[in-house]
A protein has these predicted regions:
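Anion-recognition interface
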Residues: 4-270
Length: 270
């Protein structure tokens, strides 16, 4: 079979929109399509070229690498169709901040994201319309645009949209709706941030494409951070939390500017 005749579907995340659930609990259960797991993403192009399945599903969640990765896959397989999931901005940025906090970043939310656009997370990282423009730039096919909220509200409707789009099948009895990764509490994250501000000023580097360095230089810190958060579970809340991890009033005001961006997503979501 020619590569140009193969049907290819590319789930691009975003991160913190239920990607891990899909990658562990749903995509492997789909019938009638070859799923290339996130661990094999780095060689997915070679896998597709060297095998002869009728259709393939690739999955990997992106944030700042979004355009680079979309361009890379579409350059090799222009027929690729994109699956993208968005989440309300307020919930999404909160979840991103918590993810960075548990990975050793000990800055405040205001340094992570602020209205002056001088934080680690910038306005251009927040605009979903920019990501849709990137998809349109490289793909001539209509993407499947989903809302993370629907996964919570009506999971089987959400999952069926993916199976229908990809021409695959699944059985409800095969799907576990259990959360893959539970979230850490505010108390645990605050305690870890205090720990890192003293003992680990710079977060450990993540080696996505080097397993040896990943286990030698990143994984030990990952394990220590988890131990610290487990320890914090037993400490009094009043001892740890002097102020909220995220100021809700500040967050709400900061996210107002993205109301129209979210409305655009609602208007095109499937």
């Amino acid at each position: 079979m020619k590569n140009s005749e193969k049907e290819i579907y590319f789930h691009v995340g975003l991160a913190k929109t239920g990607s891990t659930f899909l990658q562990n609990n749903f995509f492997p259960k789909l019938k009638g399509i070859k799923y290339i797991s996130t661990h094999k993403y780095w060689r997915c192009i070679n896998i597709i070229k060297r095998t002869n399945y009728k259709s393939y599903l690739i999955s990997r969640e992106f944030d700042r690498q979004f355009e680079f990765e979309v361009k890379k896959i579409l350059k090799e397989f222009p027929q690729t169709k994109i699956i993208v999931v968005f989440r309300k901005h307020e919930k999404w940025i909160s979840s991103q901040f918590k993810r960075h906090s548990k990975n050793g970043y000990h800055w405040s939310f205001e340094k992570f994201y602020n209205n002056e656009n001088t934080g680690f997370w910038r306005k251009e990282d927040m605009l979903y319309s920019i990501k849709m423009d990137i998809i349109k730039k490289y793909s001539n096919n209509k993407p499947l645009v989903l809302r993370f909220e629907e996964l919570k509200e009506n999971p089987y409707s959400y999952l069926s949209k993916i199976s229908n789009y990809t021409g695959s099948r699944y059985s409800k009895s095969d799907i576990s709706l259990n959360v893959v990764h539970g979230s850490w509490s505010e108390k645990q994250l605050i305690f870890l941030k205090k720990f890192c501000s003293i003992f680990k000023k710079n977060p450990p580097e993540y080696y996505a494409n080097n397993k040896i360095l990943h286990w030698l230089l990143y994984r030990p810190w990952w394990l220590l951070f988890h131990f610290v958060m487990y320890f914090a579970y037993f400490l009094p809340k009043s001892y740890i939390i002097k102020k909220p991890l995220i100021n809700k009033e500040y967050l709400s005001k900061s996210m107002k500017k993205y109301d129209n961006d979210w409305k655009k997503i609602l208007s095109i979501s499937d």
